[in-house]
Amino acid sequence: MREAEIRNYKKLNELADQSGIVIFGCGEDKNIPTCELRQAFAVESKVYNRSLDHISVIDAAGLYGEIVAQIAPETVLLHIGEEDKDFFTENPTEFDNKYRELIGIIKAQNRKCRIAVVSLKNYDNDPQLEELNKHLKYIAESEQCEYGDIANKKVWNPKTTRDAVSFVYSIGFAHPLKINRPLYDLVKIMFCYNA
């Protein structure tokens, strides 16, 4: 199954424009409706979802090279770690090293690439996920990346945000969410639209 998805992403990459925003995550991230969200929130940049089921931080660097590097994204939203709870518990240092390796590969490909490390959802206050998210935050800070905290349900109303973006658009600002906007806005839009 994964090989078919990888082949599909490679074919899509041949059609994709260089740069833009890439979501590189696992599990439910595959189903993020990027087209609808891009339209609803007037995100001007191209948004590509290159998420796969069961991505571990152990194989993320290789998969990034296979299915994302060809696009040469200007922004990467990393949402990796869901499959690594046991690995993290057994060896948190190795987890951190693998995540740093992934970030290093992204930066080597494009030094100006903006990277957001997105936390894992922890709506049930699982102490293991809380600790993993602390490590993700530390990794983001130490690697000079943004940290997108989506661990807890937040009071965020997508409709209100969409209406505000629409208003800004209507009064003459033609590019309300260009690539240089805060990454946290993109994280909220892409990962919290259904929270």
Predicted regions mapped to residue ranges:
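Serine-esterase "nucleophile elbow" of acetyl-processing enzymes
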Residues: 1-53, 58, 63-70
